[in-house]
Amino acid sequence: MIASIYSFLDYLKMVKSASPHTLRNYCLDLNGLKIFLEERGNLAPSSPLQLATEKRKVSELPFSLFTKEHVRMYIAKLIENGKAKRTIKRCLSSIKSFAHYCVIQKILLENPAETIHGPRLPKELPSPMTYAQVEVLMATPDISKYHGLRDRCLMELFYSSGLRISEIVAVNKQDFDLSTHLIRIRGKGKKERIIPVTSNAIQWIQIYLNHPDRKRLEKDPQAIFLNRFGRRISTRSIDRSFQEYLRRSGLSGHITPHTIRHTIATHWLESGMDLKTIQALLGHSSLETTTVYTQVSVKLKKQTHQEAHPHA
């Protein structure tokens, strides 16, 4: 089974172009399943799963009684342990995807998780930032310092484009056409799209690329955004920096880099951009995913009306 899990993780990385964040989640979820089966005696004990190939220890451990009942029992254990509904749903999705891969590879005859449903999640609307909050956040990095300049540049690109954090991390120099203000993005499932970037963001990118410290540190000739070692920056590094800027800015609420994506989508809609264009810019495969921003926009208008109306 362990060899099959590693084969699945390699498939996600090489064929499906899964992001490092996605791979970590799959590894975490399947490691939990592995430990559960080991504790029940359905699987021989082994080392924890590793994403790095050189750290892997693979022995021939067969699937033993990996049935629908075992998947149900594992999900029940997660619920009993107080895991969040979203975590449980993600974990079940990981198991379903892995089992589906095993069926295709003729390792399993059927998918034991296929008909199992996870907990229902309440519909939560994204909470975008206000224009004022965006300005406060943008002003937080110290642009007189190299890393502050890089982080301001990142924020400008986030807000200009609505890119996912994994897409920004993957951006290369050759993906930018600075003369036409266009950027080529390879999104989920290797889907490619070309989107415009604001003049303001382009100016920040040019300043950042020409900074002497960046040129001195550069060890990855393709990547645009570098870490302190001159290598391509990671999503985790961006998350850490982002949380530090939030702390310094004094902004409250649950705000992440993905919040900026929700924010610009909402601001585009409020400025009159049509849903099909927003869908294309964000790289949504379904218009239904984009439609949620109409609900967010209506919610914000109601809130503003309540706060401003003298008879409210």
UniProtKB/Swiss-Prot annotation:
Gene Ontology CC annotations of this record: cytoplasm
GO MF assignments: DNA binding; tyrosine-based site-specific recombinase activity
Q: Which PROSITE patterns match?
A: CB (PS51900), TYR_RECOMBINASE (PS51898)
Q: What positions does the domain Tyr recombinase occupy?
A: 124-306
Establish whether keyword Ribonucleoprotein is in the entry: no
Q: Name one Pfam family in it.
A: Phage_int_SAM_1
Catalytic center at which residues?
164, 188, 258, 261, 284, 293
Q: Which UniProt key words apply to this protein?
A: Cell cycle, Cell division, Chromosome partition, Cytoplasm, DNA integration, DNA recombination, DNA-binding
Q: Which residues form the Core-binding (CB) domain?
A: 1-103
Q: Which GO terms describe its biological process?
A: cell division; chromosome segregation; DNA transposition
| Cellular localization per UniProt | Cytoplasm
Family named by the database record: Belongs to the 'phage' integrase family. XerC subfamily.
Record-linked HAMAP family: Recomb_XerC_XerD (MF_01808)
Describe its partners and assembly state. Forms a cyclic heterotetrameric complex composed of two molecules of XerC and two molecules of XerD.
Reported function: Site-specific tyrosine recombinase, which acts by catalyzing the cutting and rejoining of the recombining DNA molecules. The XerC-XerD complex is essential to convert dimers of the bacterial chromosome into monomers to permit their segregation at cell division. It also contributes to the segregational stability of plasmids.
UniProt protein name: Tyrosine recombinase XerC
Q: Which organism is it from?
A: Chlamydia pneumoniae
